[in-house]
Amino acid sequence: MLNSKNNTIVTIGDINYLWGIFLLIASARKAGMTEQFLVGVRDFTPEAEEILKQLGDVEIVSLDGTSRSLTCLKSKVILQTKTDFVTWADSDAFFTGNVSDILLPANEDEIHFRLRANQEMPMAFKGHSFGEDGMSIPKKILETWQQDIKEIAGDAMEAPRYETTGSGCFFALSLARHRRFVEIWDALQEKVLPTHNVGVVDKSLQFYHQLDESTINACLNFVKDAPRVQEVFRMDKERAKLFVHFIAQPKPWQGWTKRAFRFFDDYVSLVEWAVAQGLRLPGEVPSCLKASNKSLMKLLIPWMTLKPKLARRLKGILKR
């Protein structure tokens, strides 16, 4: 079994994600995980940094001064890791238990990464299917990915390795073995992604609308020495050893979606654990993270889910 101290868990977020980052790290510490955390942050106060550092073995990397979407900077933070292995975990997520023994791929030539089933692809590529059925990566996108990798790396695979793309919210690999792969990924992000803040998706991009996720999938498909995707994704198999990613808005420290609410008790228990440990919290505990409000939060799900959608629609109208 690999030494957990030779693996760094990397995440990223701005001050609006302080609760999310805090609870991600807290979930690891509550479960007895000892991995280092490297956190890329923007607009953090010294106090906010200390709130994370009190959780133990947490290093902060300031990303102030860059206007890019933070999701486009994942590779830059990963490259600052000092350990041989690295695990990426999005900050709107948590571990349900001690997962140290399943984080890393069994083989250093592999990456622990979840490829989508064909049935998931139409949603991921909605509006970007180029007239195809959407069940696999569109040919036009693959052609662009291949050409961009060839320009950056000097050569590229003649054919894609995978039919479908994978989720960029979690992955783990040997950085000692695959640093060049991450450097190519970083260079591709510099080349093709916006330099301003566009959020986590940019539908105006024909070939890279999922930003960091599109670019890492391009690299996995066409970089010649890319790590192979591990055959079995292990972070969604056992209830006591899950990586839970809160995909949609609102995030649990703001409100709850129907899908996320399944994990209400687990997530709130992290706040209760932090309080019992005497830790400084990111602020007053939000009402949506109080066990006593569980029934109310369930009733409010339709409104809390609709609110961000209305806000986005209004923002779009005002931009016209």
Provide a role label for each language-model segment.
Residues M1-R320:
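Glycosyltransferase catalytic domains, chiefly GT-A lineage
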